[in-house]
């Protein structure tokens, strides 16, 4: 099919890629991302994709430099979600 060859993208136009979970910890459902000018905040919905499977979940908490923060847009951060994911998930957010 055309999407397998990279000729078309089925990614909705209102989603932007944040990054890939570089590490994942089952407890407390936390993933590590490196952000580059993409705003994440507690309560925001994120969309995760791996092997063609999409999951929608919300951010429960965010850590930057081992401190809890309400929002962040740069750096290596840890985010806790309400649904368990795993290493390798691509993370997306909706453009408002």
Describe the role of every protein-language-model region.
Residues 1-8:
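Catalytic cores of secreted or luminal carbohydrate-active enzymes
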Residues 11-96:
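Beta-strand/loop-dominated core regions that host nucleotide or nucleotide-derived cofactor-binding catalytic loops
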């Amino acid at each position: 099919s055309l999407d397998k060859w990279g000729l078309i993208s089925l990614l909705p136009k209102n989603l932007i890629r944040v990054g890939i979970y570089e590490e994942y910890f089952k407890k407390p459902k936390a993933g590590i991302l490196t952000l580059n000018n993409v705003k994440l905040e507690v309560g925001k919905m994120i969309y995760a994709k791996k092997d063609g499977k999409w999951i929608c979940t919300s951010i429960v908490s965010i850590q930057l430099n081992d401190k809890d923060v309400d929002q962040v847009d740069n750096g290596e951060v840890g985010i806790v979600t309400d649904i368990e994911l795993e290493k390798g998930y691509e993370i997306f957010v909706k453009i408002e």
